[in-house]
Curated annotation (Swiss-Prot):
The gene is IFNG. Pfam families: IFN-gamma (PF00714). Glycans are attached at residues 42, 61, 95. GO terms for cellular component: extracellular space. It comes from Anas platyrhynchos (Mallard). InterPro entries: 4_helix_cytokine-like_core (IPR009079), Interferon_gamma (IPR002069). The keyword Glycoprotein applies. This is Interferon gamma. It comes from the Eukaryota. Belongs to the type II (or gamma) interferon family. Keywords: Antiviral defense, Cytokine, Glycoprotein, Growth regulation, Secreted, Signal. GO terms for biological process: adaptive immune response; defense response to virus; humoral immune response; macrophage activation involved in immune response. It is found in: Secreted. The keyword DNA damage does not apply.
Length: 164
């Protein structure tokens, strides 16, 4: 129950975050729907405050907007999975699910990036063939890393104009 309640809180944060960044979400209605969902899950129970947050701490570790979109795309998917297990005949749950599906569609590229990260973490480098492939790609990977850090440095160095 604690997990679900924290999830509901983070759902509120996600909806507000994307609402502020130009999405077509109706925050007033969503807040009412989230309040009804909190009542469904008895989110005012005292055990909600026990332990660590479910998602908030994870989002804090991602600082750049594009990075946050990757982690938020996964969190939105988790909310959709959670809502599928509830009574979808209730209008507030149906509305939240529709809005989350809209968000997920706008985040589809970010979700693919997340899947790439999962795929990389599951990659087994024990076979000789895959090790050969990895070694042959090493220089290209290092080049990409250098390009990334160089472009960041160029952006952070703003051109100074002469005030003559």
């Amino acid at each position: 129950m604690t997990c679900q309640t924290y999830c509901l809180f983070v759902l509120s944060v996600i909806m507000i975050y994307f609402g502020c960044s130009g999405s077509a979400l109706f925050l007033g209605q969503l807040q009412n729907d989230i309040d009804k969902l909190k009542a469904d899950f008895n989110a005012s129970n005292s055990d909600v405050a026990d332990g660590n947050p479910v998602f908030i701490e994870k989002v804090k570790n991602w600082t750049e907007r594009n990075e946050k979109r990757i982690i938020l795309s996964q969190i939105v998917t988790l909310y959709l999975e959670m809502l599928k297990k509830t009574d979808m005949s209730k209008p507030h749950i149906k509305n939240l699910s529709e809005q989350l599906n809209t968000l997920r569609n706008t985040l589809s590229n970010d979700y693919k990036k997340f899947r790439d990260l999962v795929e990389l973490s599951n990659l087994q480098l024990t076979g000789l063939k895959i090790q050969r492939k990895a070694v042959s790609e090493l220089f290209s990977v290092l080049q990409k890393l250098v390009e990334t850090s160089t472009s960041k440095r160029k952006r952070s160095q703003s051109p100074k104009r002469c005030r003559c």
